[in-house]
Swiss-Prot record:
Keywords: Cytoplasm, DNA damage, DNA excision, DNA repair, Excision nuclease, SOS response
Swiss-Prot/TrEMBL GO biological process terms: nucleotide-excision repair; SOS response
InterPro entries hit by this protein: GIY-YIG_endonuc, GIY-YIG_endonuc_sf, GIY-YIG_UvrC_Cho, RuvA_2-like, UVR_dom, UVR_dom_sf, UvrABC_protein_C, UvrC
GO cellular component term of the entry, any: cytoplasm
Family: Belongs to the UvrC family.
Residues in GIY-YIG domain copies: 12-87
The keyword Ribonucleoprotein is assigned to this record: no
Subunit structure: Interacts with UvrB in an incision complex.
Protein name stated in the entry: UvrABC system protein C
Amino acid sequence: MLDFKILEKIPNKSGVYIFKKGEEYIYIGKAKELKKRLTSHFKAKDGKSKLIVEEADDLQVILLDNEKEALILEANMIYKYKPKYNAMLKDTQVYPYIRISNDEIPYLEIVRNRKGEGEFYGPFTNVYFTRQLFEVLRKVYKFRTCKRDITKLKKPCMDYHLGLCSGVCINEESPEDYKKKINEVKNVLKGKFSNVISFIKLKMEQHARLLDFENAAKYRDILLNFNKVMESQGVVLPESVNIDLVVGKHKTFLVFKIRSGYLISKLVYEYDGHIVDFIELFYTQNTSDIPEKIIVEKENKELKNIAKILGIKIAQAKDDLELQLLNKAIDNLNYEIGLILTNKIILKQMKELLGLMKLPNRIEGIDISHLAGKNTVASLVVFENGEIKKEEYRRYKLGDILDDFESIRIVVKKRYTKHNVPDLLFIDGGIGQVNAAYQSLKEIGKERECDVIGLAKEEETIVTLHGEIRLAFDHPVLRLLVKIRDETHRVANEFTRNLSTKKSLRSILDEIKWIGPKRKKTLLERYTSIEEILSVSRSEIEQLIGKKATESLLNELSYRRNL
């Protein structure tokens, strides 16, 4: 428990404060007046504040110039460290983003979360819309999508030959011009869709003036495709304005994102907090796309303060059109709350919709992962009554098998020869993977004891032995299956990476002077990668293997990392 005296040296300035227990972040907060806010935590007689102070053994503060800096840092740290006493935004489905990397010559990609560095635009509700928008922008602006180190490239990739990349890697376009182009893409992703329309029309006219009608026709087709993509989202405002509508109740919040008059996203989150806290957290975690205005049901003093800090306008609906949109958002929120059912009801729905033999109280999910056919592994995750059971997870090493179907057959046979089958076996993949699992169950005489289904990644289509089933992206049954799929994928990929890095480290250690079998074993028991060894102090390694061996080890690893 922390002593009240720790507050004596803390100034009454803006900043972020961090309660820690050992190395674990248990609560992160921000304050305009740090000392005043922390004093209220320490004086609390009950509730969360009392628990935090009693559990923490360390308190750190970061002083900042103003409340806005504190707000943004707090949100980013909460997102990164996920302290247990901070309320978190919980996605009710997997939303795609478009990420622009931090490289000197950035590449763009569609991602399913905000992990890693770079600028994230979105989230978008509709996967199809996101892909179509990305492809149109790619054809227009010809940005790179490859992740290779372009400073070492001598030949362009296939995208260049297909006219999808400008060839900045081989100096076909200057870095300066490329960066200007990326800034244009950023503006479009912030909702300035008229920019891309003007750009396409300009290119079309330029080619027509040069009597290059073939390329003029290409840009005409791109423009038609772009208009079709945008029209699929529906025009909700006659003016090209960028606004959001935020409504919430019963620990559920909904955000309508309107860009250039188009409704491009309907986002739903579970969050145990007030609308002020939700808006603060949501917009400080999505700083790349903050609208001109946020419409809410009711204004209050706290919302005005957040608006001032973020430099945006938060207000009630001002006319009939905005009021109609607000009511539409409220109707959608009520619908979403109705969809957030208990796990029991979701599982009952799953049984009925998928035609399962029994209620899927126990679901086991399998995924295969490998690196170019090497270090093939399988993950098996367990969900009981819709909840994760991490303690029952299993991981399997499969050697260098190239065939995913064969890998699935091996794992299913190995697992269920010795263990009872679950109510439902979930496979990350399509009909081929589902059939492989079913045939393996048939070999051991258990095919009648459980159902087997898969989830095809492209359009989140549910695959059964009898056909395909498509559900709305926000349907609770699909949300649960996506959650299982993502968990199997995460566990399998994590296992593959760990095996790969350890195998790589093992082979490197074999070549280093002064590192024999005994020292090699000591290092492998303690560290899993080159990066991990280079991140610790020299003295720590010297205590394990001695000074000479440490010198030789660090020199070799540093050299290899810089290759």
